[in-house]
Amino acid sequence: MILAAVIALLGMGYVFMGREKTMADRLRSGGGTADTAAGLTVRAAGFALLGVIPGSLYLGGAGRSVQAASLCAGLAVQLCWMLPKLRAQEPASLTVAEICAKDRFARAGLGAVEVLSLLSLTAGALAMAARVLASVFSLHTTISLGAAALLSLMLTVLCGAAARRNMDRLGVALAAGTVLAAFVLAQEMLGSAKIPLTELLAPKKAESVLGWTTVASDALWGVGAVGLVAFPHRALAAEREKAMRRGGRIGTAAIALLTLLCAGAGLLGRAADATLESRTAAETILIQIVTMESLPKPLSAVLTAGLTSALLLSAGAMMTEVGSIAAWDIALPLTGETREKPLMRTAMGAAALSAVLAFVLALDPNRPLQDYALAGLLLSTVTAAFLWARFCRWEACPLGEWMGLGLGAAAAVGWALIPATRLFGMIGAIPCALLTLLPQLLIGRWTQKKAEKAAQASEKPEKTDEPEREKAEEAAEAEEVWAEAEEELDQTEETAEVHENAAAEEAEAEAAEPTEEEKTNGSFDL
């Protein structure tokens, strides 16, 4: 199961290499927490880190039932994140900007929870990669790894990132160097005896004689490992040539810090053999599987190279994702900045800062990998539960969203810090999801009922005023009838006056005309 998860992680990483978008493209399209391609790689890294937790629980004294329940809970968390993506018809419907359009602070809070989750997973991936290197390399090899990586990074900075095609070709060549170095290391570093679990991280003696094959293999391994993690720095560059050069320098500087601090983590891990506990040694079960004698040496070398490359690639993808989330889901809603250049600076600065924090956390050789993986995956549970509620179109208010995110994140951190609850692993996903969903559901229903009561209260006065309204309507109708009657009366009076005037005029006209007798008398006078 663990090896299958590692192989799946490696395959997802290579698919991500060919299909990734630049940071500027993500900012233009609105890609943040929910719909970026790097999110798939992050969840795949969760699968690999999840494989460490059941083995730690079982070897630490937990029963098989607890181990199985923890594994099932972890798989359920991943499916809870993946299923809404599969159900969605188009990626645009998954953006956090649309999901959290009601409240910009809820959007920023969701981004902050996801940034913490990615930071924890990144530190766990880097710590795991450092322990893989410490289990395979000798002391001088670990130092040679840092020197070779630094040299290759200087060459990368001088060449610059002029085009994506050139970086792809360089990455393919460096990946081939990793495979070649793995085969060389299989013949030199892997012994014929099985490595005991308790002595897996024990310091190895430095070789007295350094052959040219050893130095060549160290250089090839360092160049190959840096080449695989050099892909994410391409995502830190914008499309313009000037921004690409600037983003390339920032990315390569972050990769140089990654390589040097990973080498330092390997050295500290070897120097801290006396402080290693049984649970810390038990968490190296994955390393023992790829370095045990029962596997052929070439296959063991390929698995070691694949595991290291996949972990470093996932760490780089998660750093890029942190930058995108910080710019799109935190800085944009809080500041209202919509210009591309400030958002790009915020994204690159957040990616570099998260890289430094993750490297510092990964330097602790006594920190169990379970702490990193458990905290990161439980915080991812909070994010997945929140987004699942939004995908299901729950009626929630900003207060419920804030309380759900706060309680879920507090439960995740507390579950990972308390030793008694930490033993149960990913079973903590259940209370974290419930504490995230219940405030949204309860407060959403409370606000809905409150709105319904307010609506009913506004309707009640209208019902009591119905008789008065009817009386007012009747009075208005009576006034209208009275006004019409008055108008008709006025019209009849006016017609009567007109008739009287006409009759008077006719009478005057008749009086003014002479009669027939007067006409005859006048004729006789003539």
Residue ranges: model-predicted function:
Residues M1-V52, T156-C159, V172, T178, ...:
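Membrane-interface "cap" regions at the ends of multi-pass membrane proteins
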Residues M1-Y14, P398-A455, E459, G522-L526:
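A generic transmembrane alpha-helix motif of multi-pass inner-membrane proteins
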Residues A8, Q78, V113-G124, L155, ...:
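Selective recognition of specific alpha-helical transmembrane segments in multi-pass small-molecule
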Residues G11-E20, T122-L126, A130-I143, A147, ...:
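Hydrophobic alpha-helical segments and their helix-loop junctions in multi-pass secondary transporters
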Residues L27-A92, L220-G224, H233, E241-T275, ...:
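Membrane-interface helix-loop-helix modules in multi-pass membrane proteins
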Residues V66-V157, L220-W221, T308-A317:
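Helix-loop-helix module between adjacent transmembrane segments
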Residues S93-A101, C159-R169, G227-L260, S278, ...:
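Hydrophobic, small-residue-rich membrane helices and short re-entrant helix-turn-helix hairpins
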Residues K102-G109, L118-L119, S324-N366, Q370:
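Loop-to-transmembrane helix boundary motifs in multi-pass membrane proteins
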